[in-house]
From Swiss-Prot:
Residues forming the catalytic site: 151, 402
Gene: NA
Intravirion side: 1-6
Residues noted as binding substrate in the record, renumbered to the chain: 118, 152, 277-278, 293, 368
Job description of the protein: Catalyzes the removal of terminal sialic acid residues from viral and cellular glycoconjugates. Cleaves off the terminal sialic acids on the glycosylated HA during virus budding to facilitate virus release. Additionally helps virus spread through the circulation by further removing sialic acids from the cell surface. These cleavages prevent self-aggregation and ensure the efficient spread of the progeny virus from cell to cell. Otherwise, infection would be limited to one round of replication.
Further facts: The influenza A genome consist of 8 RNA segments. Genetic variation of hemagglutinin and/or neuraminidase genes results in the emergence of new influenza strains. The mechanism of variation can be the result of point mutations or the result of genetic reassortment between segments of two different strains.
Biological classification of the source: Viruses, Riboviria, Orthornavirae, Negarnaviricota, Polyploviricotina
Renumbered residue ranges of the record's region Involved in apical transport and lipid raft association: 11-33
Official protein name in the record: Neuraminidase
Cellular compartment(s): Virion membrane; Host apical cell membrane
Species this protein is from: Influenza A virus (strain A/Fort Monmouth/1/1947 H1N1)
Record key words, sorted: Calcium, Disulfide bond, Glycoprotein, Glycosidase, Host cell membrane, Host membrane, Hydrolase, Membrane, Metal-binding, Signal-anchor, Transmembrane, Transmembrane helix, Virion
Region (Hypervariable stalk region): 36-90
Subunit structure and binding partners: Homotetramer.
Length: 469
């Protein structure tokens, strides 16, 4: 083959290779375009699954439930139409209490990122229930958890997370800077109340759907404080009780009526011989019933009931089955404060049914240990100590703490009555245990008209944690 033939042959081969390469590149471009078109077409579509609509979108949703599967957000669509929670139903008839949630926060926090918290509570809208809690601006098993036995600090905040989940930075939502708080839903939006500031000049910041709408300044300049449980909404108005003044003597107590985050009316209770703190409130046939803590001189619990005009009645639970802690042994009750072991106290609750009531209380008379529910059919009005039902919730040997009421509205449950529920705080750490921190987990129960069981659902985390050693 002469040189010219070699050149022609090599050139022909190069041309063929170039043409093949060009064809491959064109095919690759077409393939990429087709693949992109398919992905784009599938990015936003709906499909029917058991008559429920499942929507897949690469976008952020509000008021939806997310289920995380293989890092893909599957959004289960549901009716988010606003309604006004009427609050005009009576309490559901019940035979006992069924376990609703348990978050095991301290146990999980020994290894995972879980907030140091206290004062957890639950509140429900017509769509969902949420756990609210006061953080200490710190995580369990971390150096910043040191000294969190302190109640009031600028690091505390009201946050929320799904019921039954351990409160962590990954599932929690900031609500308000607060060392005392309340929250509730009127069917259209969340009202949050967060109190923060110095003891002699604290301010309550009211938010409606996350926007500041009102502030309330301490009027007695002596630790303004509120419920540490849910406020109550009836027919578009929400109600809360605040206390300002001594914790061991007569103080000032005010009821506030709030609409869309704005205070529309308030009154001060005329209660010179009573003490109302950390009230647990619930709606019942368009009225509001609150059962509170007497930290001054009562080992039974004070109550106040009021209508939407803030006309009120008040008294003490008469039963000789005493609900506070510390308290004397059960005996003869009183429709006024029972002074024996009446100083100090713990947040608690009861539900009234006619002349009777369900009384929630610690099992121990002198320490925050154990928890039980007692049905006293005449306890609201009769001072004897007879009761018919006792249901064990936490054993005497295990720590408990604050407790409070919350309800599930008919708009959520589909029932024709208001379902009564309660939560119990399970405090761990200081001052009773050898740790540098104070925190807790929580459990909750709802009333049912069917079979229930006695058992113990304790926190049961093994202490001390690594940070304490």
């Amino acid at each position: 083959m002469n040189p010219n033939q070699k050149i022609i042959t090599i050139g022909s081969i190069c041309m063929v290779v170039g043409i093949i390469s060009l064809i491959l590149q064109i095919g690759n471009i077409v393939s990429i375009w087709i693949s992109h078109s398919i992905q784009t077409g599938n990015q936003n579509h709906t499909g029917t699954c058991d008559q429920s609509i499942i929507t897949y979108k690469n976008s952020t949703w509000v008021n939806q439930t997310y289920v995380n599967i293989s890092n893909t957000n599957v959004v289960a669509g549901k009716d988010t139409t606003s309604v006004i929670l009427a609050g005009n139903s009576s309490l559901c008839p019940i035979r006992g209490w069924a376990i609703y949630s348990k978050d095991n926060g301290v146990r999980i926090g020994s290894k995972g990122d879980v907030f140091v918290i206290r004062e957890p509570f639950i509140s429900c809208s017509h769509l969902e229930c949420k756990t609210f809690f006061l953080t200490q601006g710190a995580l369990l098993n971390d150096k910043h958890s040191n000294g969190t036995v302190k109640d009031r600090s600028p690091y505390r905040a009201l946050m929320s997370c799904p019921v039954g989940e351990a409160p962590s930075p990954y599932n929690s939502r900031f609500e308000s800077v607060a060392w005392s708080a309340s929250a509730c839903h009127d069917g259209m939006g969340w009202l949050t109340i967060g109190i923060s500031g110095p003891d002699d000049g604290a301010v309550a910041v009211l938010k409606y759907n996350g926007i500041i709408t009102e502030t309330i300044k301490s009027w007695r300049k002596e630790i303004l404080r509120t419920q540490e449980s849910e406020c109550v909404c009836v027919n578009g108005s929400c109600f809360t009780i605040m206390t300002d003044g001594p914790s061991g003597g007569p103080a000032s107590y005010k009821i506030f009526k709030i609409e869309k985050g704005k205070v529309t009316k308030s009154i001060e209770l005329d209660a010179p011989n009573s003490h109302y703190e950390e009230c647990s409130c619930y709606p019942d046939t368009s009225k509001v019933m609150c059962v509170c803590r007497d930290n001054w001189h009562g080992s039974n619990r004070p109550w106040v009931s009021f209508d939407q005009n803030l006309d009120y009645q008040m008294g003490y639970i008469c039963s000789g089955v005493f609900g506070d802690n510390p308290r004397p042994k059960d005996g003869k009750g009183s429709c006024g404060p029972v002074n024996v072991d009446g100083a100090d106290g713990v947040k608690g609750f009861s539900y009234r049914y006619g002349n009777g009531g369900w009384i929630g209380r610690t099992k121990s008379n002198s320490s925050r240990k154990g928890f039980e529910m007692i049905w006293d059919p005449n306890g609201w009005t009769d001072p004897d100590s007879n009761f018919l039902v006792k249901q064990d919730i936490v054993a005497m040997t295990d720590w408990s703490g604050y407790s409070g009421s919350f309800v599930q509205h008919p708009e959520l449950t589909g029932l024709d009555c208001m379902r009564p529920c309660f939560w119990v705080e399970l405090i761990r750490g200081r001052p009773k245990e050898n740790t540098i921190w104070t925190s807790g987990s929580s459990i909750s129960f709802c009333g049912v008209n069917s079979d229930t069981v006695d058992w113990s659902w304790p926190d049961d985390a093994e202490l001390p944690l690594n940070i304490d050693k």
